[in-house]
Amino acid sequence: MSDNHTEHSLSLTLTPTISEQPVLPSTYLDSDINCPILKQRLDAFQRWQAEAFNSGTSAEVLIAARSDYIDHLLQRLWTFYGFDNVPETALVAVGGYGRGELHPLSDIDVLVLSKQRLNDEHAQRVGQLITLLWDLKLEVGHSVRTLEECLLEGLADLTIATNMIESRLICGDVALFLQMQKHIFSDSFWPSPQFFHAKVVEQQERHKRYHGTSYNLEPDIKSSPGGLRDIHTLLWVARRHFGATSLSEMVDFGFLTNAERNELNESQSFLWRIRFALHLVLTRYDNRLLFDRQLSVAQLLRYEGEGNEPVEHMMKDFYRMTRRVSELNNMLLQLFDEAILALEANEKPRPLDEEFQLRGDLIDLRDENLFVRQPEAIMRMFYLMVRNQDIKGIYSTTVRRLRHARRHLKAPLCHIPEARKLFMAILRHPGAVSRALLPMHRHSVLWAYMPQWGSIVGQMQFDLFHAYTVDEHTIRVLLKIESFADEDTRPRHPLCVELYPRLPQPELLLLAALFHDIAKGRGGDHSILGAHDAVEFAEQHGLNSRESQLVAWLVRCHLLMSVTAQRRDIQDPAVIQQFSAEVQSETRLRYLVSLTVADICATNENLWNSWKQSLLRELYFATEKQLRRGMQNSPDLRERVRHHRLQALALLRMDNIDEEALHRIWSRCRADYFLRHSPNQLAWHARHLLEHDSTKPLVLVSRQATRGGTEIFIWSPDRPSLFAAVVGELDRRNLSVHDAQIFTNRDGMAMDTFIVLEPDGSPLAQDRHPIISHALQQAINRSDYQHPPRVRRLSPKLRHFSVPTEANFLPTHNERRTYLELIALDQPGLLARVGKIFADLGLSLHSARITTIGERVEDLFVLADKDRRALSLETRRELAQRLADTLNPNDKL
């Protein structure tokens, strides 16, 4: 299988111009042992390492060379400070340094070991030695312990014990070091079974910190699942149990096969190379591939391409490599537990059928060559897993046979008729995703089944919107869809839980989810390309024309509902009619809303909030009503205005309001005001307006969430800069505006409504209501408002993204409105700047829908000129140019 190899090989070309390696510190004279000279020579060594790396020298060679250099430096300093004359003391390398692995910024962990506690003079000399190393800017971690203290502290602390297990003598008393080794490898010091289980728990806890996946878009090369720590865990376990000090020795002890050893060596080499490059880019120790470092690292590793392509190619290789490490790590730890430790007598396997048996709760092959002889048996195993809830996983030796068979397939599994029948049977079974598709993905069987899947494995997008790679995102979409069958999901997704049981064929939704992003990374429109793939796959798997076309439509239109709800004016009947015409039926609408919600939730866990939920619900029910009414029948807007007014009046009469005064207020309002507000909102506004001093602006902050956010209502004399003043103040208060409805009455009073959220997507905190209200009052009263208020600086993370500003004017038959879709880099004060431009050009804003997608904003503004007409072509051009000039600053704020 192709998952054996990375797609974009690194350049390893050696050049003959590399300078000679600096001399080792063991040759230094006593007169050289001072900070300036040592720092100068250490800097020269580090320059040589960078030069050698850039010239193609392998990371393995350079890592070992650095460890060797530090060995010689410490040996020379040990002698210089007279410790060669101190009996029963030793200097010991521990941790990664103990393994002989030092990257440019790695910690240098050492143990000063002694038989008896050091006297004051010797302790002072140790302090001088360590201080000198710190003055050289080396990251040195040290401990000074007696042999007895080492053993006691090692027994009490797993990390200390692990460091000691991979200790290595640098210089000093050999017998003392061997005595320590004898103790730490004895049965009384962390017995192998106890050590193993402690390291497994430690790994599980570490993985949880990274959400159980190496596919985070800013991974930690060392600690993320599938990273170097997972290889270290295997080494630690084998070191403690067998005394093995390398991957090759693990083969000798039967813990690894030759193929597995080679695969781990290749993986370690790749991860070392990326980590070495990262350390050359940084000035302080860190192992995280953050966005602002990825391009520099990719270029250092000679990845090529336009724009973000070098990063995407490098990260694809990284994710594919960590997948392999994760699979090997899980399999080998399981194998160690089941076959080598054998803590309990092996439970007698229970036959499941002629081919498979159950060992505990793990499925196991009865014939180890079955998968090679009959590749379709792989699918039979996963079909058994989805049908039998007693099966919780795959036995380690069967995973080993599966990996072997997978690499020797002559054609994709979907070319086998029986495999296709089994695949569809899996999809139609409850629990298909969690019990079959997820493990199929983890063991690269989805890739072996459908070649298209391989192209998205590890495929990232260099942005702040997509939290996972395309394959990981797709699996999360599938899992989210499956959760809609669970009543426990109802509180978070009530609409989807209500609709999911009404889908006639849920397997078609799973197929659409499987293909919705399958064409990403190919170039072109991934929705259209993916729909083409989906039709071919559906027909190959025996679906009829209606079923195939539904799957293809869902793939082609999987973004339609999200875009319409978040970036279009869904209170405009024309928008609802256009959307309904595409959807065509209530059945397709139910499929589409389920896919849309799952897609949003699986893109980024922070995206889903009550605001988005309210938008999708509103669009769903408006479309359902339109489909039931019939496409030829548009809503009666006059009747809706009358209905809203009557309902609001009924609410207000309960408060014994002055109806004559109310009608004076309402008579100044235009029809749009009544159309776009609910009766409850109309009554809320009216109650306060009737009691308010009409010579002052009114600011209301709703105590109850409106469409998932907090509603802020402003009544004030209108002026061109009002919108900019309000949104500028809201931005200064760290509130995000998601929706704005702007109305100007016949008497020139503005009646504006804003929906705002806190940074975490929640409604405005109650204790902030009076503060925000007062701040807005002051902002509105500033008659000299000319420029947006001083805004926060662009965040460091955003500085590394480039989003060219686009001003797209959407087609419409409305002669009184222009619909502007603005795409730009998200930046503090953006709305205030945009509002200032509108004011400068004399444009009136009627509504705004604000959508932030990672580092991008994709906003919709409904505009008119001073004569309440759509913008002329000349005005559009000027507006587009002003927006580009303002939102594409060269210094990025």
Swiss-Prot record:
The record, for SMART domains, names: HDc
Swiss-Prot/TrEMBL keywords = Hydrolase, Magnesium, Multifunctional enzyme, Nucleotidyltransferase, Repeat, Transferase
Q: Map out region (Uridylyl-removing) in residue numbers.
A: 352-710
Q: Where is the ACT domain?
A: 711-793, 819-893
InterPro entries documented for this protein: ACT-like_dom_sf, ACT_dom, HD/PDEase_dom, HD_domain, NT_sf, PII_UdlTrfase/GS_AdlTrfase, Polymerase_NTP_transf_dom, UTase/UR
**E.C. numbers:** 2.7.7.59, 3.1.4.-
| Top-level lineage group | Bacteria
Protein's GO biological process: regulation of nitrogen utilization
What are the residue boundaries of the HD domain, all occurrences included? 470-592
How is the protein's activity regulated, according to its record?
Uridylyltransferase (UTase) activity is inhibited by glutamine, while glutamine activates uridylyl-removing (UR) activity.
Which cofactors? Mg(2+)
Q: Where is this region: Uridylyltransferase?
A: 1-351
Q: Which molecular function terms from Gene Ontology are attached?
A: [protein-PII] uridylyltransferase activity; phosphoric diester hydrolase activity
**Per its UniProt record, what HAMAP family does this chain match?**
PII_uridylyl_transf
Main role? Modifies, by uridylylation and deuridylylation, the PII regulatory proteins (GlnB and homologs), in response to the nitrogen status of the cell that GlnD senses through the glutamine level. Under low glutamine levels, catalyzes the conversion of the PII proteins and UTP to PII-UMP and PPi, while under higher glutamine levels, GlnD hydrolyzes PII-UMP to PII and UMP (deuridylylation). Thus, controls uridylylation state and activity of the PII proteins, and plays an important role in the regulation of nitrogen assimilation and metabolism.
UniProt lists the family membership as follows:
Belongs to the GlnD family.
Q: What is known of its domains?
A: Has four distinct domains: an N-terminal nucleotidyltransferase (NT) domain responsible for UTase activity, a central HD domain that encodes UR activity, and two C-terminal ACT domains that seem to have a role in glutamine sensing.
Q: What is this protein called?
A: Bifunctional uridylyltransferase/uridylyl-removing enzyme
